[in-house]
């Protein structure tokens, strides 16, 4: 499902109105027919479509991400999948005011980059990587990763953001990232570790164990890589549940 199939970013259009449009054959901006809705709302939708096309031509999905509920921002993904950045961080604890970010991994376009505290993890590097991304995807990043980065590095993360935790809940996929991976059949190439293990590995590295850093980095990188198939799974499932279910009679 693409942004061009969506109407709920328009002020005054909820899921019920959007479904009515789809059921009446208006499944894409190109097919918009104002007679399905009132004249005032039709004018608003036409303005939205005109402005929306201009944003999409620039590869900018930010107005749509801002207008969509957190559980519906997955709709932005297909338009900018090649420029999507999957991000995960590891830290020394849960309180950004007194703990540190130890590693940050970003997966985009088939390439994974990892930055390490006291080596190459800087605000400038993070800002450069995020500026090159059209969409940010995390798991629980809205409450954890993004606020942690903003506090520890004094940066503003303004990239349109899909936190997979919310659409996963919409699909009944509860629990942490690794539990959901197991449930839908995403495999990992290494033993499963926890956030507590990540803290332990960092402290072991600080005590001189380089192997612990290697394990920590690979754990962090696996989190970001595995978010891509999870994003694809979520987008496919919700496309079926939300869009195809409403248009099945067309």
Predicted regions and their residues:
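N-terminal accessory regions of nucleic-acid-interacting proteins
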Residues: 1-81
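Short, function-defining helix-loop hinge/capping sites that tune catalysis or transport
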Residues: 22, 96-98, 148, 171, ...
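Short phosphate-engaging motifs
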Residues: 28, 122, 144-145, 223-226
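Conserved RNase H-like, two-metal-ion catalytic cores of nucleic-acid enzymes
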Residues: 65-135
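Acidic active-site catalytic centers that drive phospho-/nucleotidyl reactions
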Residues: 88-90, 145, 163, 223
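Conserved DEDDh/DEDDy metal-dependent 3′-5′ exonuclease domain
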Residues: 105-106, 110-185
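Acidic, Mg2+-coordinating catalytic module of metal-dependent nucleases/exonucleases
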Residues: 183-250
């Amino acid at each position: 499902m693409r942004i061009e199939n969506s109407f709920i970013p328009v002020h005054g259009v909820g899921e019920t109105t959007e479904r009515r449009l789809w059921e009446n054959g208006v499944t894409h901006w190109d097919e918009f027919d104002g007679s399905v809705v009132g004249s005032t709302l039709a004018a608003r939708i036409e303005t939205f479509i005109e402005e929306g096309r201009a944003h999409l031509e620039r590869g900018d999905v930010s107005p749509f991400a801002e207008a969509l509920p957190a559980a519906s921002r997955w709709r932005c993904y297909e338009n900018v999948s090649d420029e999507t950045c999957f991000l995960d961080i590891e830290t020394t604890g849960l309180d950004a005011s007194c703990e540190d970010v130890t590693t940050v991994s970003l997966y985009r376009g088939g390439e994974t980059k990892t930055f390490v505290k006291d080596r190459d993890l800087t605000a400038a590097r993070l800002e450069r990587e995020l500026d090159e991304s059209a969409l940010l995807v995390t798991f629980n990043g809205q409450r954890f990763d993004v606020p942690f980065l903003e506090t520890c590095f004094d940066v503003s993360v303004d990239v349109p953001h899909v936190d997979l935790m919310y659409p996963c809940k919409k699909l009944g996929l509860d629990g942490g990232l690794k539990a959901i991976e197991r449930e839908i059949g995403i495999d990992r190439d290494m033993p499963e570790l926890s956030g507590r293990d990540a803290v332990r590995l960092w402290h072991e590295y600080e005590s001189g164990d380089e192997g612990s850093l290697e394990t920590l980095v690979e754990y962090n990188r696996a989190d970001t890589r595995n978010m891509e198939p999870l994003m694809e799974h979520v987008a496919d499932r919700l496309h079926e549940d939300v869009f195809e279910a409403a248009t099945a009679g067309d």
